[in-house]
């Protein structure tokens, strides 16, 4: 850390960062919405709406509900604002936190020019946009990681313990967004030892540097404890447990040896372009470290930026190989490497511009080129891909490490990022998906409908086989933890083990793309001694057609009545009586 905070960021830098979300929204209008069929993202959206009910009666305790550092801000947003306004405010807050924190970090290491370049590149990089724009927890992990390091560097530089305490609070929030983020702690802790040369330059060398380090660590740890205690109070207030984090810890231990989503070998690399950038920056940073001409320009801050990326990457690789697997193959875990990758890009690879007019031009070209690549036509495909794409990305980043002039370096980096957008847009997870905005509206309307009938206890969903609206149904049922509540997805076909999930008093929701799909309920469940009392029928309109929701309460049928109902050729749910 060699750059003093006293070198204030130019005003036009602040304006550029303030305009960045608007540019992203113009290029990717639906960036604040989750994929309509993304199960886990909608699970957390459900917690935003129903934290107290889920924590106390409906789903206690699940490891999903332990991610309170992400759930609580979402809960506040969705209980103060309308769904659309809540989504905008929530995701803009985390997006801006991440971008501004990255700018602050790189500015302290390499100056404001490199900081602005890396912040703009990060803010317009598609995996970062998607991570910070959907309701899954990886965006929260990214934002809290960058905020942790930004506050820590500010606190250590000025010897202000309250900033170190605040950094600890952010670290606790990172941990309680996903307990696996504990593996990023080593990459944060390496920033604690004092940079003696930098302190001497500014006349801040303490008499006992290691005692000062110990005190900073204590204050930082105190921040983590304070964050955990605060979330424990929230958990108890919502009807949950004070040790809200334990289900996540136990789940992680159980998953240590077996992961049903694991992939073997290395063939997955060619199909995972989100892995290309961290891998390329990793290699390029090592090139910058190993080359004599590059090593001479590496300050302590730049060395730590490289070490943080290398350390986190090695931990991820070991975790992927020796742990539960599929970590680097899964884009919402690989995204955790983005903070360290873009810190290294800004601190090590971008270089330091000395001419302000060139700096302005480079940032403008970078922003416009990357924004254009975000609207890359789906019909256009880059000639290279797979392993050739990975090799090309590594080659371009390595070139950036050996080029001496900052402007050519940045041109090469931007070219690599634009190429990555081309390969990413060809994948199902990052490619065009026109139903994000409509899915958000439909699912939130669906939540309003379901909430009129389902209050405290878990519902059970009976789904007819999907035709063209299955992604809407998957998103809506994910609000209610999907596999926890779906009894059958082929209704009226119901297996005995599925039927046993429905007992007298259970509230059942039949979702179908045709009207009267709930009619066979009595006939199907008569052998199990149940009939259905219709509570209501609703229609949920999507841009592709309507969904029909029928709400029933399962009632116990006496054995004689059940046998008669089973023999009946035509059966329908018992109508609600006045």
Regions found by a protein language model. Give the residues of each.
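Membrane-proximal lumenal/periplasmic loop motifs of glycosylation machinery
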Residues: 28-37, 51-75, 79, 84-85, ...
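Membrane-lumen/periplasm interface segments of specific transmembrane helices
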Residues: 73, 194, 212-289, 314-320
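Membrane-interface alpha helices of multi-pass inner-membrane proteins
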Residues: 118, 163-178, 186, 226, ...
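Membrane-interface transmembrane helices that cradle and orient dolichyl/undecaprenyl
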Residues: 110, 148-164, 174, 197-201, ...
């Amino acid at each position: 850390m060699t750059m003093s905070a006293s070198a204030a960021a130019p005003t036009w830098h602040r304006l550029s960062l303030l305009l960045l979300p608007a540019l992203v929204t113009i290029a990717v209008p639906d960036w604040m919405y989750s994929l309509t069929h993304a199960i886990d993202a909608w699970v957390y959206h459900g917690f935003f709406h129903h934290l107290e009910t889920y924590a106390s009666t409906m789903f206690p305790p699940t490891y999903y509900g332990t991610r309170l550092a992400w759930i609580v801000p979402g809960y506040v947003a969705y209980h103060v604002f309308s769904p659309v306004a809540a989504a905008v405010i929530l995701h803009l807050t985390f997006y801006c936190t991440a971008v501004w924190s990255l700018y602050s970090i790189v500015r302290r290491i390499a100056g404001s020019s490199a900081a602005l370049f890396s912040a703009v590149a990060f803010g317009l990089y598609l995996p970062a946009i998607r991570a910070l724009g959907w309701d899954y927890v990886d965006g929260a992990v990214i934002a809290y990681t960058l905020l942790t390091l930004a506050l820590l560097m500010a606190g250590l530089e000025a010897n202000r313990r309250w900033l170190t305490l605040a950094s600890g609070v952010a670290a606790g929030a990172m941990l309680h967004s996903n307990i696996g983020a504990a593996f990023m702690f080593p990459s944060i802790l390496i920033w604690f030892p004092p940079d003696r040369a930098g302190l001497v330059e500014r006349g801040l060398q303490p008499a006992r540097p290691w005692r000062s380090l110990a005190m900073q660590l204590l204050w930082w740890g105190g921040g983590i404890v304070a964050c955990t205690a605060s979330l424990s109070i929230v958990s108890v207030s919502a009807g949950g447990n004070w040790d809200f984090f334990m289900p996540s810890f136990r789940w992680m231990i159980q998953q240590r040896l077996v992961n049903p989503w694991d992939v073997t070998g290395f063939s997955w690399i060619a199909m995972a372009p989100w892995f290309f950038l961290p891998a390329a920056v990793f290699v390029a940073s090592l090139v910058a470290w190993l080359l004599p001409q590059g090593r001479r320009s590496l300050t302590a801050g730049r060395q730590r930026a490289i070490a943080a990326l290398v350390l986190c990457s090695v931990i991820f690789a070991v975790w992927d190989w020796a742990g539960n697997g599929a970590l680097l193959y899964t884009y919402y875990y690989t995204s955790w490497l983005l903070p360290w990758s873009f810190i290294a890009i800004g601190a090590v690879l971008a270089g330091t511009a000395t001419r302000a007019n060139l700096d302005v031009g480079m940032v403008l070209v970078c922003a416009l080129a990357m924004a254009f690549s975000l609207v890359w036509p789906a019909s256009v495909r880059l000639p290279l891909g797979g392993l050739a794409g990975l090799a090309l990305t590594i080659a371009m980043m390595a070139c950036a490490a050996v080029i001496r002039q900052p402007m050519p370096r940045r041109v090469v980096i931007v070219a690599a990022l634009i190429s990555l957008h081309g390969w990413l847009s060809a994948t199902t997870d990052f490619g065009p998906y026109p139903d994000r905005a409509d899915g958000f509206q439909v699912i939130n309307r669906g939540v309003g409908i379901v909430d009129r009938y389902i209050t405290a206890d878990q519902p059970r969903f009976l789904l007819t086989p999907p035709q063209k609206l299955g992604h809407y149904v998957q998103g809506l049922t994910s609000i209610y933890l999907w596999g926890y509540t779906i009894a059958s997805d082929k209704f009226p076909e119901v297996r005995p083990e599925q039927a046993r999930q429905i007992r007298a008093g259970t509230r059942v929701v039949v979702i179908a793309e045709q009207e009267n799909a709930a009619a066979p309920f009595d006939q199907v469940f008569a052998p199990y001694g149940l009939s259905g009392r219709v509570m209501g029928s609703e229609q949920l309109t999507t841009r592709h057609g309507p969904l029909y929701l029928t709400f029933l309460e399962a009632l116990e049928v006496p054995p004689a009545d059940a046998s008669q109902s089973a023999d009946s050729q035509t059966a329908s749910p018992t109508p609600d009586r006045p």
